[in-house]
Regions:
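His/Asp/Glu-rich metal-coordinating catalytic cores
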Residues: 1-66, 71-286, 305-319, 338-342
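Short glycine-rich phosphate-binding loop at a beta-alpha junction
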Residues: 92-94, 386, 551
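Solvent-exposed loop and beta-edge segments used for protein-protein assembly and interaction
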Residues: 14, 142, 288, 460-462, ...
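Conserved hydrophobic residues forming the short capping helix/wall of the S-adenosyl-L-methionine
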Residues: 107, 402, 537
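Hard-cation-handling environments
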Residues: 199-329, 333-358, 362-518, 526
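C-terminal tails and terminal domains of large nucleic-acid-associated
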Residues: 518-554
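Broad gene-expression machinery/nucleic-acid interaction feature
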Residues: 130, 145-147, 463-467, 547-549
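Short Gly/Ser/Thr- and Asp/Glu-enriched loop/turn motifs at secondary-structure junctions
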Residues: 121, 416, 543-547
Length: 554
């Protein structure tokens, strides 16, 4: 019996790290390979990837990786995934022109040269094993965004990627509504649709409304202007450049990813900058304040981003000062609100004026609102619906919208990462869960991280560490030297000498008790020391630093 399996490995029940496995006749196409950024609780973690163990075991069955667009939550994990899969067989990668250019740049950074990268024109049909592949042009906050239509014997699996129905886009034509309708008439088996803004009524504003409001905001500013947005939001960068040109201001790009993406955008003709307008960050001070616009990364409060460093006066090239205006031309991704608010607060402390989308229409979402999601459902008329790209609340709301436009509730499947949807001629049903979850990137290391490791990092960052080194006799467990007490990062330790003496006294009492009870095993003695020290430190400080006893036998 012919069967199609759709297995989301990321992007359901969360915002970010989108990754979907579509399987048919024993062959696999992977749609998107995204990452997400760590929450504040993930201390020391740089990036979070989907757990792609399922793909590692099936590497030789993968026909291709197809990427809907060039945002990090859809493309960012590509180097790590390819490096892991390449040991068996390096799958080819397909996407639009800008998407492939960004993929190439990312792979070059990771020194991955032996990857087959294929640009696909909208409407072009390719054969990938038992699948046909077509990219359908969509509008989003980045050029060359596409929906992925995978044809199978049972019908088309349509993964929308991120989209909105923008009738007046700033770059290129509107979404290919006629092709979506044609696919609907031909037979869409399953629609996997973007749920990001399902909780917002009506239609999303067009990207083209942002430009005039940016120019209006710029005209009110007498000092320097810093605009922060996603580095991949090529359309927004163009509108900032246009607004700056209208007011005869120079533009400087700050942030490595901003410079890289703008360079790619200019090469492909998506960004046009007048000659002599761009200046380097070190040249900003050569011009009067009223003639400078800085376009910076950091709209999400990322710890190492350019704007965050400016806000904390830690940027080597740009020093913000009173009278500067910072325009947030982006809204926080769910989960980033705290980091963004902290950045804004630091900017106010410096004396900057801050403009956010709450103050003026300086941002338009790249994701369609509820009426656009209804339009997608009505255009493609899918047999089955599986909401994608959202937390569980948004997935539920998307399912309710599907029912509202006439799709039977039993044909709408609210899934989660790792839960495959199996479809054959008899119907659709969830299969047995597959391994899914998070893979952490910590510096150059990549792998799973146990909850205990993250808990230890949180404990160290919040309350510090005490290390107690004791030397005991191998024969009878007696103390052979005065205990050594070392502490780092322990807050509010005003009377350190007094506490250290108390710790030493308690340690000696514990060692004496262990020797008296003929306990000489070092691991048991360490446990006794840990319990006694942790209790003492909590009683004195009302905090729980990590306590690490070290027992040396002589």
């Amino acid at each position: 019996v012919s069967k199609v399996r759709v297995l989301p490995l990321g992007g359901l029940g969360e915002i970010g790290k989108n990754m979907t496995v579509v399987e048919h006749d024993g062959r696999i196409v992977v749609v998107d390979v995204g990452l997400r950024f760590p929450t504040p609780e993930m201390v020391g973690i740089d990036l979070v990837l989907p757990d792609f163990s399922y793909l590692r075991e099936r590497a030789s069955d993968i026909e291709a990786i197809v990427v809907t667009h060039g945002h990090e939550d859809h493309l960012g994990a590509l180097p790590w995934v390819l490096r892991e899969l390449g040991a068996t067989q390096m799958p080819p990668v397909y996407g639009g022109a800008l998407t492939i250019a960004m993929a190439r740049s990312k792979l070059d950074e990771h020194k991955l040269k032996e990857v087959e990268l294929n640009e696909v024109e909208d409407g072009e049909e390719l054969e990938l094993g038992p699948f046909t592949l077509e990219l359908v042009h969509m509008t989003h906050s980045i050029p060359d965004a596409s929906a992925v239509a995978l044809g199978t014997e049972l019908g088309t699996v349509l993964v929308t990627g991120d989209y909105k129905f923008d009738q007046t886009p700033v770059d290129g034509p509107p979404a290919d509504v006629s092709r979506l309708a044609e696919l609907g008439r031909e037979g869409v088996l399953l629609l996997c649709g973007d749920s990001t803004n399902v909780d917002r009524d009506g239609f999303s504003p067009s990207e083209s409304v942002v430009g005039p409001h940016l120019e209006e905001a710029f005209a009110r500013c007498e000092g320097r202007i810093v605009v922060t947005s996603f580095a991949s939001n090529i359309h927004r960068v163009q509108q900032v450049v246009d607004a700056a040109a209208a007011l005869d201001r120079k533009v400087s790009l700050v942030g490595r990813s901003m410079r890289k993406n703008v360079g790619i955008g200019r090469t492909l003709g998506h960004i046009e900058v007048p000659d002599g307008m761009l200046v380097g960050p070190r040249e900003i001070n050569d011009f009067p304040d009223e003639r400078v616009v800085i376009i910076s990364t950091g709209s999400q409060g990322e710890p190492l981003s350019a704007l965050r460093r400016m806000a904390y006066r830690d940027h080597r090239q740009v020093e913000l000062r009173e009278g500067d205006t910072v325009v947030f031309s982006a809204t926080p991704i769910p989960g980033n609100e705290r980091a963004v608010n902290e950045t804004i607060d630091r900017l106010y402390h410096i004396g900057c004026d801050v403009v956010t989308p709450r103050d003026a229409p300086v941002h338009a979402s790249g994701h369609g609102y509820a009426e656009e999601i209804k339009l997608m459902l009505n255009l493609v008329k899918p047999r089955y619906v599986m909401p994608f790209h959202g937390d569980f609340k948004r997935l539920r709301l998307h399912a309710q919208l599907a029912e509202a436009v006439g799709i039977a509730p039993e044909n709408t499947y609210q899934g989660e990462n790792g839960l495959p949807l199996d479809i054959d001629e008899r119907g659709a049903r969830f299969g047995s869960p597959e391994q899914s979850g998070m893979i952490f990137v910590d510096g150059v290391e990549i792998g799973e991280m146990a909850d205990v490791a993250l808990r230890d990092r949180r404990m160290l960052s919040a309350d510090g560490i005490f290390i107690i080194v004791v030397t005991i006799a191998e024969q009878d467990g007696r103390s052979m030297a005065e205990p050594e007490v070392i502490f780092r990062g322990v807050p509010f330790l005003d009377e350190a000498d007094e506490l250290i003496e108390e710790i030493r006294s308690t340690v000696e009492d514990t060692i004496e008790r262990a020797a008296k009870d003929r306990i000489t095993e070092t691991d048991v003695v360490q446990d006794m020391l840990h319990d006694d020290m942790a209790k003492l430190v909590y009683d004195r400080l009302k905090r729980r630093p990590m306590v690490l006893p070290v027992v040396v036998e002589v």
